Swiss-Prot record:
One of its GO terms (molecular function) is thymidylate synthase activity. This is Thymidylate synthase. Pathway: Pyrimidine metabolism; dTTP biosynthesis. Its EC number is 2.1.1.45. It catalyses: dUMP + (6R)-5,10-methylene-5,6,7,8-tetrahydrofolate = 7,8-dihydrofolate + dTMP. Belongs to the thymidylate synthase family. Bacterial-type ThyA subfamily. GO terms for cellular component: cytosol. (6R)-5,10-methylene-5,6,7,8-tetrahydrofolate binds at residues 183, 282.
């Protein structure tokens, strides 16, 4: 939790104002931030200086794992984060590749499960990684990438957290996740939960111990309409102890994640927090 607040303070102290053309707002911005999550110790990085909700973040991750491309599918599993980008983003509404209400296009999980090949076929990146790791194989290329510039025009949003690189050392699995851009007050809370949970799940379904997750962010920013709440409220609160994430031990395969797993299979224990803060969201 301290590393999160340290990043927020760094942005406030050292950040540069940058105009964001997509949102029409200014962002206080720093370049390069590194966060580390001790998955092996189950120090779940759920923000404690404001009330935070983990289930929507895990639901979104589950939707990516399943390759969902429709906001309605995300809603069914408890995640509403794609409603605005699918239906309120004017550039996407005018895009000829949009198939209709709730369509997200070829974003995130679609790329992870069905990356298009020149011959017309697709590559299931996640399946390959799971198969390798289950056999104890790390070919130094166990990489899940959502970043496909050739199809950016076919989706409502470029991926922010775009690449997950798995590394197997002995019987311990580690993860390095790369993020090009991060809305620190709102998005990072989601992203931290997802990086942690992705490593925990992948270790569980491939039969390994979970090690450390490394989260690398390039552009870390606070929007101008979020700054006052962060600077004058959240950052002044004392962080509390990290909670624990409990995952149903019956989840043993990628097929389980694709079929029957729900948010009831995840529980956070020992979560103490300060009062909620409602930050503005920028579409």
């Amino acid at each position: 939790m301290k590393q999160y607040l340290d990043l927020c303070q760094r942005i406030i102290d050292e950040g540069t104002w940058v105009e964001n053309s997509r949102t029409g707002k200014r962002c206080l911005t720093v370049i390069n931030a590194d966060l580390v999550y001790n998955v092996d110790k189950n120090e779940f990085p759920l923000i404690t200086t404001r009330k935070s909700f983990y289930k929507a973040a895990i639901a979104e991750l589950l939707g990516y794992i399943r390759g969902y491309d429709n906001a309605a599918d995300f809603r069914k599993i408890g995640c509403n984060t794609w409603n605005a980008n699918a239906n309120d983003n004017q550039a996407w509404l005018n895009n000829p590749h949009r198939k209709g209400v709730d369509d997200m296009g070829r974003v995130y999980g679609v790329q992870g499960r069905a990356w298009s090949k020149p011959d017309g076929g697709t590559i299931d990146q996640l399946r390959k990684i799971v198969d390798d790791l289950s056999k104890g194989i790390d070919d130094r290329g166990e990489i899940l990438s959502f970043y496909n510039p050739g199809e950016f025009h076919m989706g409502c949003l470029r991926p922010c957290m775009h690449t997950h690189n798995f590394s197997l050392l002995g019987d311990t699995l580690h993860l390095t996740s790369f993020q090009r851009s991060c809305d620190v007050p709102l998005g990072l809370n989601f992203n931290q939960v997802q990086v942690f949970t992705l490593l925990a799940l992948m270790a569980q379904i491939t039969g390994h111990k979970a090690g450390t997750a490394f989260h690398k962010i390039v552009n870390a920013h606070i929007y101008e309409d979020q700054l006052e709440l962060m600077r004058d409220v959240q950052i002044k609160r004392e962080p509390l102890s990290s909670p624990k994430l409990v995952i149903n031990p019956d989840i043993k395969s990628l097929e389980d994640l694709e079929t029957w797993v729900t948010m009831d299979d995840f529980e956070v224990t020992g979560y103490e927090h300060h009062e909620a803060i409602k930050y503005p969201f920028s579409v």
